[in-house]
């Protein structure tokens, strides 16, 4: 973010009007590749002494407009369909630089929003996806109903371009955007095919993620705009928290009330609900409320009408599920969460009389989805579908140290992520599967049985790291209080350094 401000030096009042000329600036491509490559990427041929040239970018954009889309040669099969030239050079140069340029408006807006909200100091902790669960523990125990909302995607590309026009006033820039998207996706299709989306995501993931997050940001901005324009609702301010990596967004609204049509202006007070909470990560959001499901159903159809009428995306009403927190769990960020009653008995004595008081308290349970996680491990060939560990043949060619290190890293990552679980038994089972799979892989490499391998090499102590790693970390934090250590290890621990979901956890 600081690099953008140093290089661009844009006046914020005019920053959205002149994006097209930035495509011809060499430092844009330095920002795109400077952190990954030691030398410049703007090299058309290795014989040019690795000199970067602005003329290359201008030539490439000229070729885009002059290219005949109806003439294809059989010899062009190994070339990029977008350029007709070397795909490893031209497409990477323009696509990565182009993605940096289109991120600039939201980058500067992010910086200003963080400064206005005065949350810059705590921003690093808020970037962690585990920071959502303490919010659940604090707020959701007082709520009764939860709605599981999945944001529909993809949408027509022209809708995305028209949405961008409200934020960026630059006609030449949008001509280039249209041409850029046209070459990657089927522009004439109302709903972009999954095949073209997959191709586009592999060739330019940064720009695709920008478009997706901009689309989500736009539909959530409509909620905030209508709320601020409503004179009946006097609610606290909101905050938009972007994760800097690819602009994934995470928003927590403690008191969110939205009305989606002017016809409801006379009945706003009837729909006011001060106990609505909204949390989103990537394409999945959770809407929870304390009141009756009547309002939740209203919200459900508000979402559907907004997607259909404003973004022209079809969404089935059955795709949004409304459940009761005390009876059903909701799946979010790899955990099954629900609210249950926790009964405790307190004995009180007053003079000669004693009383036994039973107290019921609501508690948020976060459970490891063991069946789904075993399914992910089976897909990755660590076990079969029943959860029985198997060897990993593709790793048997590596050294013993590399094999153990790979299994340990996977085990530590899963343990690190699921240490917030209310019940540790499922986590121990996952550790057992990975531990035994590691032993079987080593035994397969040495052409021995598991028992003979452990007896001959004495590897049991080395493999105990699968179960002792978390205890060692907590012993460093609490070196003198063993009872506190045991209590914390049995309880939930949320880490504020997790900014993405592990591939085995993410089952989307």
Swiss-Prot record:
InterPro entries in alphabetical order: Domain_X, Maturase_MatK, Maturase_MatK_N
Alphabetized Pfam families for the sequence: Intron_maturas2, MatK_N
The UniProt record lists the keyword Plastid: yes
Gene name of this polypeptide: matK
Cell compartment(s), UniProt: Plastid, Chloroplast
Gene Ontology biological process terms, A to Z: mRNA processing; RNA splicing; tRNA processing
HAMAP family reported for this sequence: MatK
GO cellular component: chloroplast
GO molecular function terms noted in the UniProt entry: RNA binding
Residue ranges the record marks as coiled coil: none
UniProt keywords, alphabetically: Chloroplast, mRNA processing, Plastid, RNA-binding, tRNA processing
Protein family (similarity comment): Belongs to the intron maturase 2 family. MatK subfamily.
Organism, scientific name: Amburana cearensis
Protein name, per record: Maturase K
Its job: Usually encoded in the trnK tRNA gene intron. Probably assists in splicing its own and other chloroplast group II introns.
Principal subcellular localization: plastid
